[in-house]
Amino acid sequence: MGRHLYRTGFLRANGLQFCKGILHEDEEFTPRVLLQAQRVVLTGQEIYYYDNCRAGSITHAEGLSTRRVQDRLRIYDSLAEIYRTVTPRALRRRLQDDLCWKYLDCAARFDCRALPGYRPQRLRMLQFACTPRRRAKAALFALSPELFRRVMNH
């Protein structure tokens, strides 16, 4: 079910479009759109319905494929750069904390060391974490991504 509806003129005026060729492109697109918007209207109405239960849908796929993880990490790096300039600071911290949760979730579920060019964002996640529980997880990840993964999956 989709709950996002955008004015075409707004998207064009701000140069907003989906990144082509990546999975989970909405995870990168939606935050950029919301940060550009001067006004957002929330509604409980279904705007449109799409079938994500079809065979091969990434929404319901078991586990994480290498491509899914690579695309997610690329998205998270892109969002980290965007979030660096967000004001006010409280909003920036909340966005970074959410990004930390997404990154740590990905690192817990997939052994990222096998990815070409992978560099664990150990200190970045520690800087981004806000809540005590998330800071503890980020600290463990910073000390040892392998131990973090074992603890999270035990």
Placement of each model-derived feature along the sequence:
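Catalytic core of nucleotide-sugar-dependent glycosyltransferases
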Residues: 45-54, 60-87, 109-125
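Conserved nucleotide-sugar donor-binding catalytic segment
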Residues: 1-63
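Gram-positive cell-envelope targeting signals
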Residues: 16, 37, 58-59, 72-76, ...
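Short secondary-structure transition/capping segments
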Residues: 71-74, 91-99, 129-143
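Catalytic cores of nucleotide-enabled group-transfer and carboxylate-activating enzymes in metabolic
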Residues: 1-5, 17-22, 49, 66, ...
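Membrane-interface aromatic/basic loop that binds lipid-linked glycans or pyrophosphate carriers
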Residues: 108-154
